[in-house]
Regions:
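Cleavable N-terminal signal peptides of Sec/SRP-targeted secreted and luminal proteins
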Residues: 2-18
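Catalytic-domain carbohydrate-binding cleft regions of carbohydrate-active enzymes
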Residues: 22-419, 536-596
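Generic structural signal for alpha-helix starts
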Residues: 2, 183, 428-430
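Extracellular/luminal ectodomains of metazoan preproproteins built from arrays
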Residues: 19-21, 446-450, 591
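Short, flexible coil/linker elements and helix-boundary hinge sites characteristic
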Residues: 13, 292, 354, 428-429, ...
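Catalytic and substrate-binding regions of extracellular carbohydrate-active enzymes
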Residues: 372-375, 382-563, 572
Length: 596
């Protein structure tokens, strides 16, 4: 029996003292500043001044942002400025841009606009000159949504780009923005793929983990240098030296004993690179005001990490789980999550059996689309600003309003889920397609065939393989006696209990204030204002009842729900396991094929 447990942790971590004796470095002691030019990527969600459909976002990068980055780079050179511009972007975007599917059309009706030959050549020349670069991760991922094989492919994407352009990149660094953390279990996988460091910039409204700005994150005997920026990616830089915004000295990574600092010239969600060379010059002036004694240079992650490596033994050590409060997105589209997991299962099995190889362009391209499923963008609110229409009847009426925020939001979610279809299309005639289709069929609810079943009395005890077991009227095991006579279940310790839970605004006020303490910008989406006032929202667990119990051979768990009505009100569906605690036994959680 496979049990998925999604753990959401926000660590108040324990740091281990290293006995470091080097003197603390102040900003006046910094002699060199490494400047990383980036902008935040949401593959979907939002765009400045237009609807953020996935297709619109990709087209904006392909037709405007990438050409603009190239132009800004060469304008500085041609005009004779000493300042340089290096644009750090994402391997998934670069790969899709260079090997662009020419006929890709999304459910919104938006067609992907591939670059023409001239734009592509200019982009490649900028790469070869070192002015366009990328970090080591595919994009802003939620790693725990993927299996080990998919995580490895995400890193492989950047390795393949490096190989394509003859780039010998040491001290490779994964960048993750918006998402406030990830699982400790990712460390061995990243180390296996040659990653030296992880850089995390937390959404400004979200509660960050209790970790220092630069530390060594350990999992057993493996570790990553980790740069952690709370309350922003950082935020976008300001307009002038007196207003630095996210380019203040407090936003930069500074390591005791090292006279180099790392600062981010960050632009916000899908804002692209600086609009022109003048904006780049302003960025340099802002940083010079923050570090008056330093040389400022556009840089890359690995250049700074190479300098931190000799100091890593003196960094604070964090050896606990961090977790990711944004993993709540996994429950926002249960069908997409089920399809995602099905695709990853089939792909992993196919690769392990040697029936699939990344040398096959079909498998490689399909894997590239599969990566998008675990990117941190699950959908969008479509611009809905509605704290009135909470009841189901009101909600259904709003769904019928043409071109409304509700209809836009539905299209956003459909578009994100559609990436599963693109993966299948990319596979063409590969044998994996039939396996995927069968997995997808298994996901879809169907009234079970009871041919090999026989009905049993719900109140009676059953025996299966020497185990004595009994179900309660809610369908949960309340007795499970093993071959040694130990009972693992009881009335207060049910196994496999389906729980349906609804919530009211009080629940969400507490949730919002805990996870999103620094801003009210997301209050409508996360806080559910006026939900209880304008509906009959209840905070309660609802009773379930078994109507019939049937027995068959073997052990399998398939939970299906028929006739479920759509609702705007928040609800939770849980499959609960609460075994009897026994001395000498403990829970193990499986993460990336490893039990912890």
């Amino acid at each position: 029996m496979n049990l998925l447990i999604a753990a959401v942790l926000l660590s108040c971590g324990i740091l281990v003292s290293t006995g470091h004796t080097d003197k603390e470095i102040g900003t006046t002691d910094i002699e060199y500043v490494h400047l990383i030019f980036m902008n935040h990527l949401d593959v979907g969600y939002a765009l400045p001044s237009s609807l953020g459909y996935l297709g619109n976002v990709l087209n904006r990068y392909f037709t405007e942002y990438f050409p603009r980055a190239v132009k800004v780079t060469f304008d500085l050179l041609v005009l004779g400025y000493q300042e340089r511009f290096i644009y750090t972007t994402h391997p998934w975007l670069v790969s899709l841009y260079l090997d662009c599917p020419p006929n890709m059309v999304l459910p919104s009706g938006i067609k992907l606009q591939c670059p023409d030959a001239e734009s592509k050549t200019d982009f490649i020349n900028a790469i070869k000159l070192g002015f366009i670069t990328w970090h080591a991760g595919p994009m802003n991922m939620e790693f725990e949504m993927m299996d080990e094989s998919m995580n490895e492919f995400g890193i492989q994407l950047s390795l393949d780009l490096d190989k394509r352009f003859g780039i010998d990149r040491k001290y490779r660094t994964v960048s993750q923005r918006d998402v406030p953390g990830t699982t400790q279990a990712i460390i061995p996988i990243l180390k296996k793929m040659g990653i030296s460091a992880l850089s995390i910039g937390v959404n400004g409204a979200t509660c960050p983990a209790a970790v220092p700005p630069v530390f060594l994150w350990k999992n057993g005997n493996q570790s990553l240098i980790t740069l952690y920026h709370p309350r922003g990616y950082p935020n976008q830089y300001g307009p002038a030296p007196m207003k630095p915004g996210g380019l203040s000295k407090n936003d930069c990574a500074i390591v005791p004993g090292l006279n180099h600092a790392l600062c981010f010239a960050f632009r916000s969600d899908n804002d692209g690179p600086p609009v022109d060379y003048k904006e780049v010059l302003t960025v340099y002036e802002i940083v010079r005001a923050q570090f008056p004694n330093a040389r400022i240079n556009a840089s890359k992650f690995e250049d700074f990490i190479a300098l931190v490596i000799p100091h890593q033994s003196s960094l604070p050590v964090f050896s606990q789980e961090m977790g990711d409060v944004w993993i709540q997105g996994a429950g926002s589209d249960p069908l997409k999550t089920a399809l995602l997991r099905a695709q990853y299962r089939v792909r992993s099995k196919c690769i392990k059996s040697k029936k699939c190889s990344l040398d096959d362009p079909r498998v490689y391209n399909a894997s590239r689309f599969m990566l998008k499923l675990a990117e941190h963008t699950w959908g969008s609110n479509g611009g809905i600003l509605d704290n009135i229409h909470w009841t189901n009847d009101q909600f259904y009426k709003m769904l019928t309003v043409p071109n409304s925020g509700y209809q836009n939001a539905s299209k956003y979610w459909d578009e994100q889920r559609y990436m599963t279809n693109l993966a299948i299309e990319a596979l063409g005639n590969h044998s994996m397609v039939e396996d995927l289709k069968q997995e997808f069929l298994n996901i879809m609810p169907n009234v079970p065939d009871l041919t090999d079943f026989h009905q049993v009395d719900i109140s009676s005890s059953q025996n299966c393989g020497g185990f004595d077991l009994k179900f309660n009227t809610q369908g949960a095991l309340v007795k499970l006696i093993d071959l040694k006579g130990q009972n693992w279940a009881g009335a207060d310790n049910p196994l496999g209990q389906f729980v349906y839970r609804t919530y009211n605004q009080t629940d969400f006020d507490e949730f919002f204030n805990t996870t999103t303490p620094f801003s009210k910008d997301f209050f409508l989406g996360i806080g559910k204002p006026n939900m209880t006032k304008n509906s009959k929202a209840e905070s309660t667990v609802w009773d379930t009842k078994v109507t019939a119990l049937f027995a068959s051979k073997g052990i399998d768990v398939v939970l299906q729900w028929f006739g479920k009505v759509p609702t705007r009100l928040p609800e939770g569906m849980h499959f609960v396991f609460k075994p009897v605690e026994k001395s000498g036994y403990k829970w193990w959680m499986k993460k990336f094929e490893v039990f912890k």
